């Protein structure tokens, strides 16, 4: 079993922090402090060492401390490839983020080769009533823990889709290049769709096997390509190539690609009630989301033999005693580095006795 965890974390000019240095152990860490003290900012800084834009999906210019030209996050991290120095650096005027692994630049989408991470924030509780784009990104972030190349594939797909849209918009008469682009999109789409379906299968198995204090969910993906894979209807790659070819005129008028894996939606149902999570109460939605995160942790550890870093922002708020106790027991048994934010320790005193407390 490989444990992914931080040994140290340094923030410079990061949001409300001028300088912050933390030395931590591979145990649960509880960040306490008043609202506005920067607890979630620390979780966000850690999440930057995983593919994407962090747990807030913030603009880079919002991350730097007001009036400062740059910000930097450094971490000494026990990674999949051993202990290593990681850093990410943002210059306000360039609106670019540079990430380094042992002083060598790496692409953001390469981070899943080194780290494994799961997080849950209050903002995510609206995921079921949000856009299909948000749900799809949520699913893809889960996939990163099972396939380290998934983020890179998504970036390549976006690149080829942008190129296709550009060729169609500018009426470039280069059918050979367009054909190559659509073939690349089709091949990548097939892999991405299969990755998503495989991950949903892993997650569903974990949900069905585990009895806990949270409602069980049925997971599925609503997408033409994924559905054809499930039905084993035909040569998927050829089907995608044909669809892209046949929608060229339509897409030229629309100015976008109207067909593809970027249109799929991640669907979640309350298993017992047999209704989509978006129709459940807000309390039920939060409980279902927690159940999905627990399944993600269990399936990731079981199938990859890697324990991710877990980031939880105010997770214990509005939970009843039974569910709160279940989570504390679950986290303790996992033997992972867990970061939890809380304004105070009310109701989690016993859990706090086994954790590293950091008061801001």
UniProtKB/Swiss-Prot annotation:
Q: Which cysteines are joined by disulfide bonds?
A: none
What is this protein called in UniProt? DNA replication and repair protein RecF
Q: Which UniProt keywords apply?
A: ATP-binding, Cytoplasm, DNA damage, DNA repair, DNA replication, DNA-binding, Nucleotide-binding, SOS response
Q: Where in the cell is it found?
A: Cytoplasm
* UniProt cross-references to NCBIfam families, sorted A to Z: recf (TIGR00611)
- Please name the GO terms that the record assigns under molecular function: ATP binding; single-stranded DNA binding
Record's superkingdom? Answer: Bacteria
One Gene Ontology cellular component annotation?
A: cytoplasm
